[in-house]
């Protein structure tokens, strides 16, 4: 087998917008910032929460004259 053909697999820190952070390993080589993690995602927390990305829900409601 050929040597040195695989990317480097290093430890990175993933930080969520809720403030939660954890360490994992990745070939990306830099830290990640994510919007939703298992600590704040409605499926894992059991709380109903509307996740609006870039105002898309508001644009939809405005287009069809729906109340919030």
UniProtKB/Swiss-Prot annotation:
Official protein name in the record: Large ribosomal subunit protein bL31
Subunit note: Part of the 50S ribosomal subunit.
Keywords assigned: Metal-binding, Ribonucleoprotein, Ribosomal protein, RNA-binding, rRNA-binding, Zinc
Role summary: Binds the 23S rRNA.
Top-level division of the source organism's lineage: Bacteria
The keyword Isomerase is annotated on this UniProt entry: no
Entry cofactors: Zn(2+)
PROSITE patterns per record: RIBOSOMAL_L31 (PS01143)
Organism this protein belongs to: Nitrosococcus oceani (strain ATCC 19707 / BCRC 17464 / JCM 30415 / NCIMB 11848 / C-107)
Family stated for the protein in its record: Belongs to the bacterial ribosomal protein bL31 family. Type A subfamily.
GO cellular component: ribonucleoprotein complex; ribosome
Chain positions recorded as Zn(2+) binding sites: 16, 18, 37, 40
Entry's Gene Ontology molecular function annotations: metal ion binding; rRNA binding; structural constituent of ribosome
Lineage, highest ranks first: Bacteria, Pseudomonadati, Pseudomonadota, Gammaproteobacteria, Chromatiales
Cofactor note: Binds 1 zinc ion per subunit.
GO biological process: translation
